[in-house]
Structures are given as structure tokens and as C-alpha cells.
Regions:
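Short, solvent-exposed loop/turn segments at secondary-structure junctions
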Residues: 10-12, 39-41, 107-110, 129-132
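A short, glycine/small-residue-rich beta-strand->loop->alpha-helix junction that serves as a flexible
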Residues: 5-19
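Short aromatic-enriched loop/helix-cap "lid" or pocket-rim segments at secondary-structure transitions
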Residues: 17, 44-48, 66-71, 115-116, ...
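Extreme N-terminal starter segment of soluble prokaryotic enzymes
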Residues: 1-3
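An amphipathic, basic-hydrophobic alpha-helix
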Residues: 65-111
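N-terminal strand-loop element at the rim of the active site
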Residues: 8-11, 24-76
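Active-site proximal beta-strand in glycosyltransferases
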Residues: 101-103, 117-154
Length: 156
């Protein structure tokens, strides 16, 4: 199979898992091409070493926005718009090629990558750990209603 892989991961366990998965697919003689925005960490276990083709797509960032982003520990809305624009471009590149499937990993900033909105090929979105904020929101909501989020049993 001809497989396109997309990720915007930081270094860590998810990146290690992806690295080993790509290595495994290559051992099975699949063609694996990797597409990443410049915000992805490729210093830790670089996929360039284990894939057929590797492409980095630049995400526009000015030095001022980079400093502000570092101070705030997160990207601004403008940074996210630039990231979305880059991921849309990557999706278009993949859509124009003859891939059988696209394997998509999480995004380090928005969890579900913007690329998912634009990809037209059959795809697999691997989401090993969903963002847990929704659980906290539910617990707060239940507290305000005077209910506990835990199941209760009635004694008879």
C-alpha cells in the first residue's frame, strides 16, 4: 500500500509509537511518505530515517509571535490560523497524490488536526489519548446541578 502519514507531535511517547509504527509498515514493504508542519518535533526519533519520503511544510511565525507564544505557553489565534492554512495545504498535496490511505496522528496544539477537515482520501485518525477537559466540564456542570458525577447505589 502507499500510505501518507501526517503528524504535529512533540517529542514523547506518541512520537515514539508513531516512529515504531512507520518502521513496522516499511518492514512490511509498504510505501510510507511523511508530511509534517514545521511545528512538529523531528529531532526526537526523526521519521526521515524510517520513511520513503519526508516533507516539512513551513508554518509562518514571526519572532514577535514566537516570543509571545513562548511566554503564554500556547499559540495565539493567529498562530492557529497559520497552522490551519499550512495543514490545508498539506491536505491538498496529499489529495492530489495517489495514496491508498492517510494515517493521521494528533496535533500538539489542537489535538484533532485541522488537516482532518480537508483530507479527501480514506484516512485513519489515531487518537490515543483524548483531551480530558470535557470530563472536568461535565463534573462542574453536575456539581452545579447538585449531582455527583459518580454512580451511586441505593441500599435496600
Amino acid at each position: 500500500m502507499k500510505i501518507a502519514v501526517f503528524h504535529n507531535l512533540p517529542s514523547g511517547g506518541a512520537k515514539r509509537s508513531l516512529y515504531n509504527f512507520v518502521k513496522y509498515l516499511m518492514r512490511l514493504n509498504h510505501t510510507v511518505d511523511v508530511f509534517v508542519p514545521s511545528t512538529a518535533d523531528e529531532y526526537f526519533l526523526p521519521l526521515k530515517e524510517v520513511s520513503n519520503k519526508f516533507q516539512v511544510f513551513w508554518v509562518e511565525r514571526t519572532i514577535t509571535r514566537l516570543i509571545k507564544s513562548t511566554i503564554r505557553y500556547g499559540p495565539s489565534l493567529r498562530d492557529l490560523a497559520d497552522l490551519e492554512r499550512t495543514q490545508r495545504y498539506i491536505a491538498n498535496v496529499i489529495n492530489r497524490a495517489d495514496y491508498d490511505v492517510v494515517y493521521i496522528e494528533q496535533d500538539r496544539y489542537v489535538m484533532s488536526p485541522f488537516l482532518l477537515k480537508y483530507i479527501k482520501k480514506p484516512s485513519i485518525y489515531y487518537c490515543p489519548q483524548p483531551l480530558r477537559t470535557s470530563e472536568a466540564i461535565l463534573q462542574n456542570f453536575l456539581k452545579k446541578l447538585g449531582r455527583s458525577g459518580e454512580k451511586t447505589s441505593s441500599a435496600s
